[in-house]
């Protein structure tokens, strides 16, 4: 039995029906769970003697609108957690979808892995995913007056406001975007169009 097969077996033994999906792809294991089970699953991932994922390496938000060929019919927003077990030398990815696309909320894991604090703030700022119970959920990368969440797929590519220096006021001012919207479809050079010679 390989290490990945052993990890998958341990995950199935420990979680049973608490995980809704277990997948191996490119020598990496990904599991999914429902949002109400997140804290239970997270605590077991960290504390169970067969798992020992004591390190949260990264956490990121994902917007699955128009995922793949546009045929995605699942929930829109997810948080993806990347874990490392230093003592067992294994890695794991956990994906949890927020149950409400209009107001995505997941429980915070800051009490389990304190490093999640700024990761969750970044995910909130860029995707608008709320983390219930977070000690200080406020914007991290965008300005305090910023409108919207720039990594959402429905956010306008040119933004909503632009800032410029106003020499009369001697400060930076915000104004509505003056750039005309345009179709930003990438141009593809097909292989048959290359000149080989």
UniProtKB/Swiss-Prot annotation:
Entry keyword Transferase: no
A single MF term (Gene Ontology): NADH:ubiquinone reductase (non-electrogenic) activity
EC number: 7.1.1.-
Catalytic activity: a quinone + NADH + 5 H(+)(in) = a quinol + NAD(+) + 4 H(+)(out)
Main EC class the enzyme belongs to: translocase
Bilayer topology term: Peripheral membrane protein
Keywords in alphabetical order: Cell inner membrane, Cell membrane, Membrane, NAD, Quinone, Translocase, Transport, Ubiquinone
Example of a GO cellular component annotation carried by this entry: plasma membrane
HAMAP family: NDH1_NuoC
Subunit description: NDH-1 is composed of 14 different subunits. Subunits NuoB, C, D, E, F, and G constitute the peripheral sector of the complex.
Function: NDH-1 shuttles electrons from NADH, via FMN and iron-sulfur (Fe-S) centers, to quinones in the respiratory chain. The immediate electron acceptor for the enzyme in this species is believed to be ubiquinone. Couples the redox reaction to proton translocation (for every two electrons transferred, four hydrogen ions are translocated across the cytoplasmic membrane), and thus conserves the redox energy in a proton gradient.
NCBIfam families (alphabetical): NuoC_fam, PRK06074.1-1
Protein name: NADH-quinone oxidoreductase subunit C
UniProt organism field: Methylobacillus flagellatus (strain ATCC 51484 / DSM 6875 / VKM B-1610 / KT)
Gene: nuoC
